[in-house]
Amino acid sequence: MVVNLTISDFTWDGFTASWSPSGGEFDSFVIEVTNLENFAESQNLTLSGDAFSLGISGLNPNTSYMVGLYGLYQGSFVEPVYSEATTGGK
């Protein structure tokens, strides 16, 4: 299970996502960033199972995004966690 998805360090084109896994070691994590204005997937990134944060940039300013975090555990994705984040202005 992945818990405590936190968004911090906001900039005009991005932010940092960090999380705390519990219940065992994960094979990998997938972060999906979706623009909430047009529901287009902005980024889909795969990280190693020992990564617990990611700086995300290259997004649109003053835009709301949904950040989804999926953990791959023993070959299966566990229930994802989500957090909403809004980039700042230039």
Residue ranges of predicted features:
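Extracellular low-complexity, O-glycosylation-prone stalks/linkers
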Residues: 1-60, 64-90
